[in-house]
Swiss-Prot record:
Organism: Chloroherpeton thalassium (strain ATCC 35110 / GB-78)
Protein name: Holliday junction branch migration complex subunit RuvA
Entry's localization field: Cytoplasm
Region (Domain I) residue spans: 1-64
Any GO BP: DNA recombination
GO cellular-component term (any): cytoplasm
Organism lineage string: Bacteria, Pseudomonadati, Chlorobiota, Chlorobiia, Chlorobiales
HAMAP family: DNA_HJ_migration_RuvA
Region ranges (Domain II): 65-143
GO MF entries: ATP binding; four-way junction DNA binding; four-way junction helicase activity
Entries under Gene3D superfamilies matching the protein: 5' to 3' exonuclease, C-terminal subdomain, DNA helicase RuvA subunit, C-terminal domain, Nucleic acid-binding proteins
Gene: ruvA
Subunit field text: Homotetramer. Forms an RuvA(8)-RuvB(12)-Holliday junction (HJ) complex. HJ DNA is sandwiched between 2 RuvA tetramers; dsDNA enters through RuvA and exits via RuvB. An RuvB hexamer assembles on each DNA strand where it exits the tetramer. Each RuvB hexamer is contacted by two RuvA subunits (via domain III) on 2 adjacent RuvB subunits; this complex drives branch migration. In the full resolvosome a probable DNA-RuvA(4)-RuvB(12)-RuvC(2) complex forms which resolves the HJ.
Alphabetic keyword roster: Cytoplasm, DNA damage, DNA recombination, DNA repair, DNA-binding
Length: 200
């Protein structure tokens, strides 16, 4: 199962994008919310994916955030809500707005979206209310773990600079510059950039 694609954004339209990975172009369906978060054509992109399997076709859906993908999966599990309507819903409101509407039981906000009738809105609220609360906790745990891993990488890079003989003030200044330049860099990336700033 594809979890994500990392490559070059070749084309982007209102509901579709093409990402090239190792010479292969992947067509992904996206929501308007995802479209707003895309980089410019030609830039590198890491996009989360969901493969929807039908009898006559395989369709890839793309998401910038874990939350968007998880909510999409919850939506298509509801009877009467297919991937097309799920994307329409995620285009009409953010996942945060959807969560607020569902928890508040606000059918009016949901029926304001094209294709969502009163019965569908009521079904969405009934089936998602508890699941969205649990999803929040699940995502918070994942993001906390990610932040912890990132902090450990930064701590290791800082310790390496100290072991190389740099003072704390110089190491801290170099690390701030390195983090600003490569916020998601590995230990080696951070050390390399930090050393460049120290030597400049």
């Amino acid at each position: 199962m594809l979890s994500y694609l990392s490559g070059t954004l070749i084309e982007k339209f209102s509901t579709e994008i093409v990402v090239e990975v190792n010479g292969v172009g992947y067509l992904l369906n996206i929501s308007a919310t995802t479209h707003e978060k895309l980089p410019a054509i030609g830039n590198q992109i890491k996009i989360l994916t969901y493969l929807y399997v039908r009898e006559d076709a395989l369709q890839l859906y793309g998401f910038i955030t874990t939350e968007d993908r998880e909510v999409f999966k919850l939506l298509i599990a509801i009877s009467g809500v297919g991937p097309k309507l799920a994307q329409t819903i995620l285009s009409g409101m953010s996942t945060a707005q959807l969560r607020e509407s569902v928890i508040a039981g606000d059918t009016k906000a949901l029926t304001a979206i094209a294709g969502v009738g009163k019965k569908t809105a009521e079904r969405i609220i009934l089936e998602l209310k508890d699941k969205l609360v649990k999803l929040d906790l699940k995502i918070d745990i994942k993001e906390t773990a990610f932040r912890s891993d990132k902090q450990q990488v930064r701590n290791d890079a800082y310790s390496a600079l100290i072991s190389l003989g740099f003072t704390k003030s110089i190491a801290e200044k170099a690390m701030r510059a390195a983090i600003a330049e490569v916020p998601d860099g590995s230990v080696d990336d951070l050390i390399r950039v930090a050393l460049r700033h120290v030597q400049s």
